[in-house]
């Protein structure tokens, strides 16, 4: 059964839209945990467009589940992670003009650089996950880097047409199996919603789904705790086949 990591970046987005102090993502993380979140995920971007350094520092002190820090593969971010010591670091690609992360890391092209960073972090007791597309060559690169986890990019599945989704779901299923055969542990995320999460949650070997925007959007209507409860229920009892998205049973 997959667990749920709640990404609270979009709470910080609301705050930063007015350059004010509310809503504060730190107490919101507590509400997410009360709603059943198995972990809290934040992305500290180089441009600090939403999550700020003080958020990460305070979340490290207050999160009672797991704190997953998403970050670019830079010396600055590695230094922050080594100081804060989150429960996991997920290295992600980052571009200044993007609205959100647009694809997976090119681990093959960046293997030497990533290997050094993975070693630094894991030597300090911080497990590292690499955010990648479900492609065998990239998964092999993850293994070569020394990383113990991958997070599969679900964007093509989540944003695909009705006709494309079964194919993209099959890629995620095959990618999960391939990664596990290589000794990697598997998370997934990007663009998952209440409407499309169940087939991904049902993939054998899937350990955690990191989900943010849809939960925060739902929270506007029902509150954050209830929004998390509803997503957790879908993940714990997925009702659709992981290959074809059809109802189970």
Curated annotation (Swiss-Prot):
Annotated catalytic residues: 43 (proton acceptor), 70 (proton acceptor), 190 (proton donor)
Annotated catalysed reactions: 3-amino-2-oxopropyl phosphate + 1-deoxy-D-xylulose 5-phosphate = pyridoxine 5'-phosphate + phosphate + 2 H2O + H(+)
Amino acids binding 1-deoxy-D-xylulose 5-phosphate: 9-10, 45, 50, 100
EC number, as in UniProt: 2.6.99.2
Gene Ontology terms describing biological process: pyridoxine biosynthetic process
Annotated site residues (Transition state stabilizer) in this chain: 151
Molecular function terms, GO-annotated: pyridoxine 5'-phosphate synthase activity
Transferase is among the record's keywords: yes
Job description of the protein: Catalyzes the complicated ring closure reaction between the two acyclic compounds 1-deoxy-D-xylulose-5-phosphate (DXP) and 3-amino-2-oxopropyl phosphate (1-amino-acetone-3-phosphate or AAP) to form pyridoxine 5'-phosphate (PNP) and inorganic phosphate.
Protein family: Belongs to the PNP synthase family.
Protein name: Pyridoxine 5'-phosphate synthase
UniProt organism field: Synechococcus sp. (strain CC9902)
Lineage: Bacteria, Bacillati, Cyanobacteriota, Cyanophyceae, Synechococcales
